[in-house]
């Protein structure tokens, strides 16, 4: 029988000092036999996805206390990728994931907490907490802040839906008037919550649901809706049950590694491919799998991508649907239900509610459930009122979207595409693979060949795009922006958005060893591995070289002979200490970022730290 971890600090005469300190936090004699549960919050006023979380930790803590546990809250950092984007701040985004994971480990292990409730929402916070949870392997439940309502405004006598990406594209389009750009900017992000499309934050919150570590509805129920409060209340109660099951009944099924096992990771990736999620999810799932000691690699993702169809299309791949529409169509479990009927899921998995996948679908799939409360929950909709307050409205759709032939979520028979929304490409300058969000690629450019325009920083590429130096047919290559080379693996949302604003969204390709925002669409290929700074062949590409992209056949090729590539590699090595570094880039890199870069691996490994360098 496992012993409560917290007993280390609450039992025994030699822990009198620790108990004295616990008493100073409000604990009493009756608390010293109860489980101590960490409420890991991520409130910050910097991030709209987290601005409403201040009081939600207390909400969870009160339920923990009422259910027989002791709740102790702490906070992690949270970077807003959208605000950090387009300048040096983006260098810090991905490294913050490791800091979040480490800070959770530090707090939980330093104070011997028995379990956790993780209150996350945005891009690197959910992955960082997920990595920590699987590293620590103590009972955990995730409950996120929820998606933002889609922006809406009237343009050309038509009401259109908007998000952050629209504001960026219109702001850079010289053909758009200042008045229209300002109108879109003011309408794009109307409420608290994670940005309203299937961007990285919402993708990851959907995936925690598919992994079984969060409750049904977590990935899609709006941040502003009153129904979301119940997820927080339930999390506080349920975590005490899970904790007691493990420590008092020796039930290891309550542990995250036994819930989020390899079968669950395969289901989560299957969901991601089917819903056309962010390419960043590949990076984060690979990293989380390593923390869980699960053998889940790019090869597994490649295999899944070849058999899973695209059953859902959401912004940025279309402006017709946002997360509020996904929720109305049944949310994550609506998509999983269709995948299950197609025979594409592992059914022998459980979630934090203790339900198997078939049991969960029976209760929560809107196409089969008889539970009117579930149907009511999935009718939770937007209010269209600007607010930063959680649970501030209770509007509902008049009906559910259960049209699997022409609705937001499709059945296998009526899939948007027989090929899924993500694909892994391999070739002679991406030997370990690269990722493309096929859900956002127009059919006309699934095969694309063109001359390379090479840039050694995102800034240089943006200047060239806006300066008219990139033309129709070009393949823009941005290198030395990987985990080590950036350092920090910047997102390339500005280059892709500016290609659209210049009318080149369907006329050019963009390839990088960096990564893309979940808001990216178009022929945007990222995560090229090995990266340039690690000796990757992408460092050897020169202006004018022909690059051939063939998404249907999962191929990407630099059309040079092996002899020419070898000669260029030899010339690169001859640069000595300057080998595999940018030639003319001026970038100030802090000590903290250099420390990150010294241990960073390429994207095919999840950009995690190289344990072998530490003897691990």
From Swiss-Prot:
Cofactor binding notes: Binds 1 [2Fe-2S] cluster per subunit. This cluster acts as a Lewis acid cofactor.
Record pathway: Amino-acid biosynthesis; L-isoleucine biosynthesis; L-isoleucine from 2-oxobutanoate: step 3/4; Amino-acid biosynthesis; L-valine biosynthesis; L-valine from pyruvate: step 3/4
EC assignment: 4.2.1.9
Lineage: Bacteria, Pseudomonadati, Pseudomonadota, Gammaproteobacteria, Enterobacterales
Gene3D superfamilies given in the database record: IlvD/EDD C-terminal domain-like
Cofactor: [2Fe-2S] cluster; Mg(2+)
Gene, per the UniProt record: ilvD
PTM sites of type N6-carboxylysine: 124
Catalytic site: 517
Purpose of the protein: Functions in the biosynthesis of branched-chain amino acids. Catalyzes the dehydration of (2R,3R)-2,3-dihydroxy-3-methylpentanoate (2,3-dihydroxy-3-methylvalerate) into 2-oxo-3-methylpentanoate (2-oxo-3-methylvalerate) and of (2R)-2,3-dihydroxy-3-methylbutanoate (2,3-dihydroxyisovalerate) into 2-oxo-3-methylbutanoate (2-oxoisovalerate), the penultimate precursor to L-isoleucine and L-valine, respectively.
UniProt family annotation: Belongs to the IlvD/Edd family.
InterPro entries: Dihydro-acid_dehy_C, DihydroxyA_deHydtase, DiOHA_6PGluconate_deHydtase_CS, ILV_EDD_C, ILV_EDD_N, IlvD/EDD_N
Catalytic activity: (2R)-2,3-dihydroxy-3-methylbutanoate = 3-methyl-2-oxobutanoate + H2O; (2R,3R)-2,3-dihydroxy-3-methylpentanoate = (S)-3-methyl-2-oxopentanoate + H2O
Name of the molecule in the record: Dihydroxy-acid dehydratase
GO cellular component, one term: cytosol
Pfam families: ILV_EDD_C, ILVD_EDD_N
Residues where [2Fe-2S] cluster binds: 122, 195
NCBIfam families for the chain: ilvD, PRK12448.1
GO terms, biological process: isoleucine biosynthetic process; L-valine biosynthetic process
Species name: Salmonella paratyphi C (strain RKS4594)
HAMAP family per record: IlvD
